[in-house]
Amino acid sequence: MSPTSVTSPPDARYSRTVTWTIAIATLAILFDGYDLVVYGTILPILMDDSSQLGSISAGQAGMLGSYALIGVMVGALVNGAVGDYLGRRRLMLVNIVWFSAGMGLAAMSTSVEMFAAMRFFTGIGIGGLLATTAALVAECVPAAKKNLYNAIVYSGVPAGGILASVLAIAFRDAIGWRGLFWIGALPVVILLPLALVKLPESPRWLVSRGRLDDAARVHATTGIPMPTEADLAHERQIEKVGFAALATRRYAPGTALLGIMSFVGLMLTYGLTTWLPKIMQDAGYNAKGSLLFLVVLNGGAVLGTLIASRFADRRGPQRVVATTFGLAAIALILFTMGFPIAVLLALVAVAGTGTIGTQVLIYGFVSNYYATSARAAGVAWCAGFGRLGGIFGPIIGGAIVSAGLSNSITFYIFAGVAVLGAAVTLFVPQARSRDRGAATAGAPMMGVPATA
């Protein structure tokens, strides 16, 4: 099939494709968020009842929280290395199966060692999904709304956290922690069949690999635009593919700073989501009351991110990300000052926007910073290197709890980390090789006549 024979399909077809793509991607990321937060909801049970997996100290609990994140780092980096060669759709399907299997195996764990191994295994699938989803979304949605759609998809992370927290409050006593993990295995049953039918490949990626006929077929079927001639000229300036492109002079400074931003964002995200229920329980709240703080943290992230993403589309993500980091620092400091419960919950919601929500915005920032040939690698770099921060977050919280220090120390440390994140964000250089889809909205598409 010749790409020159394809004309631009009706907008309705493209709108349906975008809707399905965003829905599938959001559900996949929601279960990722569920997986990464559900551990914090069951941590008090595992620490208080040695009959579950054995005796677990605070230090061991922090390490168990980090094993999944080590897996995420490995999965993101591996998928980033191959994602710009193998495509977005194929890897998303593989990773849905992978992390679902990991959750089911974790539910059957009979020892701390087996549980740790399965958390690592699950993390590999989650990391792969996080790395490939942002690239697919960036290449399939309208350029003018990339940050908004990215925020919708990655708001699945805090939405999954809300789901994990609510289900733990409602059903943890009835189905136990193993039942909560079995819920995390459902995507292989309810999401995979849908993704097999409705999830498209990116025409932009297909063109970048020289598969013009395949790209034209996807374009004709889904309405996803082919890249413009200006896009292709821009892509030819990027001589290397994948991680090799990240080390070029064009990208190296920004890549380093974006990695630090993600490191900070994920340190805050996983430090708080792992230890907030335990800290609030130690502060005198009952089990369900302490989980309520986790619900509000993630709820604030969902709402705040959707609002912030609109500003990011209009004014650019850089200043918006720096601002949300700053909001996190302020909220965490104020959280130590003994305000009434209503004020504390409001501060937790703001902290959710500034921590979990900021990381969502960072994914959007990163996915639109790189050219197609380096996009999956760029997202994978930030998701992978950032997981080092996610690993240290729970460990830092565990060390503070083990040392018997004031809970305020935890919040002060995380507030300082947020200030660092804001400062680093402001120094990221402008992307000289950013996607030019918005700037070339009226340009002729590759293989499509301008009059089509």
Features from the language model and the residues they span:
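Intracellular cytosolic loops and amphipathic helices of Major Facilitator Superfamily
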Residues: 1-11, 196-254, 436-452
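Extracellular/periplasmic helix-loop-helix junction of adjacent transmembrane segments
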Residues: 40-74
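Glycine-rich segments within core transmembrane alpha-helices of 12-TM secondary carriers
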Residues: 147-173, 187-188, 385-393
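Cytosolic juxtamembrane N-terminal segment immediately preceding the first transmembrane helix
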Residues: 1-34, 38-39
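Cytoplasmic helix-loop-helix junction between adjacent transmembrane helices
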Residues: 118-155
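Extracytoplasmic gate region of multi-pass secondary transporters
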Residues: 40, 247-305
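Structural signature of the two symmetry-related core transmembrane helices
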Residues: 90-104, 319-333
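Helix-breaking motifs and short loop linkers at transmembrane-helix boundaries and internal kinks
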Residues: 87, 108-114, 142, 338-339
